[in-house]
Amino acid sequence: MRLSHFRQADTRFATFLIVSLCALGLLAASPLAAEAQSAGTSAPPSTAAAVTAPEPSIYDRVWRFAEWYRDGSNPVVQRVLFTGRYQQDFAVVGADQGDLNEWNVRRLRLGPRVTMFQKWTVHAEVELNPQERDPFYVRFTDAYVQWAPSTRAAVTVGKQSVPFTMEGATSSKELLAIDRSNLANNMWFPQEYMPGVSVSGRKAPWVYRAGVYSAGAANREFGEFNGGLFTLGVVGYDFAKALGVKEALLSGNYVYQHTDVHNTLTRRLEHVGSVNFKLDTNRWGLRADLSAADGAPGQSGLWGVMAMPFFNLTNAFQVVGRYTFLNSADPNGVLLATYENRVVRGRGDRYNEGYVGANYYFYGQRLKLQTGVQFARMRDEANDGGTYSGAAWTSGLRIGW
């Protein structure tokens, strides 16, 4: 691999990192300045007041822009939120097969979320691409109505996320690594949002989800409804209380897809099974996934494993490691990950990846910087353009509201 390519990108990456850190550092410093000024002009609050009504941080005040309306006494509309995310990447790839160096607005989504009649939610978000004029409007992601009479059951109808596999079930706002692993890229459905009907809920320590979705041809709204259907079943049990930790969720996921040539919202997989585990002790934790899939015509069956430990050095600084392995039964069954795929378009049959990264949280998952280096190798037994050996360095700003 040509690691000299990383040195060529140092200036641009340093600029991105310095500008981001300075801008966010000013925000982080603002509460201290405000507190110092307040301390010099007013008497300190009583202990009781400090406990019951802590002063909101600058981040709390800034993020209030997302709450447009709230009135719990209104019998019709109780809350209106402006939801969304902005995610900016700087990616460098240096591989034996070629190089890549780019800025990328990875995700820009926004829309309203309205709570009505106490138990109903209407949510819609669109994805935009500010880097190009055509198409600036990419698609609807969420467009659904949900009825949730309690935490034990919620019925959702419309275009919604389809959460299975460890990282496929994790919002891009909450990923520990800067991007999902190649296991999710190959065995989850990266379109993520599909039209369908689902029922989900939690009755501690159990969680569950069941849904039926359209897998037809994709378009920017709800799809063409001209292909097959697929079903999803999820059952999980949280061992947190038994282990004395924050979270220890063991989940089983199963997807069955009626394969059809028009199914472009999904991967060409008939059966997908995943057993995944999420452990969080507050100080350290682990994400793990063992998944397997039967291919539809034109796609080999494959299986994979992913393990991702993390350690919280402080309340704001976190280090993450990850190992991913994928293997397909036949040649050309494995795709490369997002930025690697822009260097090598071909497929292979065995993939290994190691990742080391760090995250700095300014305001929890709502405002953070992430960076990570991955070293990956793909074998191409067919020798038809899928071989890959290289390193990728991706850093990014993540904002969610």
Predicted regions and their residues:
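N-terminal periplasmic/intermembrane-space "pro-region" immediately following the signal or transit peptide
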Residues: R2-L3, L26-Q87, W401
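Outer membrane beta-barrel
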Residues: E67-A218, G227-L232, G236-A242, L249, ...
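Active-site-proximal beta-alpha loop/turn segments in soluble metabolic enzymes
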Residues: G211-E224, V255-H262
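Bacterial N-terminal signal peptides
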Residues: A14-A29
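Short, well-ordered amphipathic alpha-helices
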Residues: R64-E67, T231-F239, Y355-N359, G396-R398
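Outer-membrane beta-barrel pore domains
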Residues: V51-P56, G94-G98, F117, P135, ...
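Generic detector of N-terminal low-structure segments
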Residues: Q8, T15-I18, M306
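N-terminal secretory signal peptides that target proteins for export/translocation
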Residues: M1-R12
